[in-house]
């Protein structure tokens, strides 16, 4: 599942159906029925206990920013024209790595009671006028990536310090963090599973 407006380059779902199917034909028929924005690329037959959401061991997201107005990429990049210090934001990324309570970057009204996530990697890259944030973790909270990016941009614009960023994480308070960025720049890019199953 992703937040409304978020893109997915790799996404999985599971369905329980009879094995007595022509799966190639089924795949083609499903793609004919789906809207233009959605394409089923392939299928695999899995063990009965496989669950597309709960069997995943990690997920990777990217948040894409363009510092130049690009009409043809408007739905895929968030346009932010401010000067941004990538080095400072990468320094703040180091504070995310490991097992942390990410309450500060979660939706305020949520049914979730476990806010701990293990972040394996987080970094910013820049190519020409495009800036991309990549983050990989075992799980994500609703709105988490967008809130992290919004807060890191405050670091990158020298509105808050690295220590402030650490204090925000430690506060476990959403009101301490920065605003969430728009959903349109966020992409689910990879979902990892164990080989068995």
PLM feature spans:
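Structured-RNA-binding interfaces characteristic of tRNA pseudouridine synthases
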Residues: 1-197
């Amino acid at each position: 599942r992703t937040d409304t407006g978020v893109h997915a380059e790799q996404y999985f779902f599971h369905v329980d159906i009879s094995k007595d199917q022509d799966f190639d034909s089924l795949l083609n028929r499903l793609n004919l029925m789906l809207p233009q924005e959605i394409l089923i690329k392939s299928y695999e037959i899995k063990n009965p206990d496989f669950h597309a959401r709960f069997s995943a061991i990690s997920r990777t997201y990217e948040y894409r920013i363009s510092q130049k107005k690009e009409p043809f990429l408007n739905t895929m990049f968030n346009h932010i024209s401010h000067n941004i210090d990538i080095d400072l934001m990468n320094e703040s990324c180091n504070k995310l790595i490991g097992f942390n309570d990410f309450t500060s970057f979660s939706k305020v009204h949520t049914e979730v009671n476990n806010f701990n996530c293990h972040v394996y990697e987080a970094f910013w890259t820049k190519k020409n006028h495009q800036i991309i944030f990549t983050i990989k973790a075992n799980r994500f909270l609703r709105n988490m990536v967008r809130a992290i990016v919004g807060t890191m941009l405050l670091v990158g614009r020298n509105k808050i310090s690295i220590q402030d960023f650490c204090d925000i994480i430690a506060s476990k308070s959403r009101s301490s963090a920065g605003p969430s960025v728009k959903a349109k720049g966020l992409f689910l890019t990879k979902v990892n599973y164990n080989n068995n199953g």
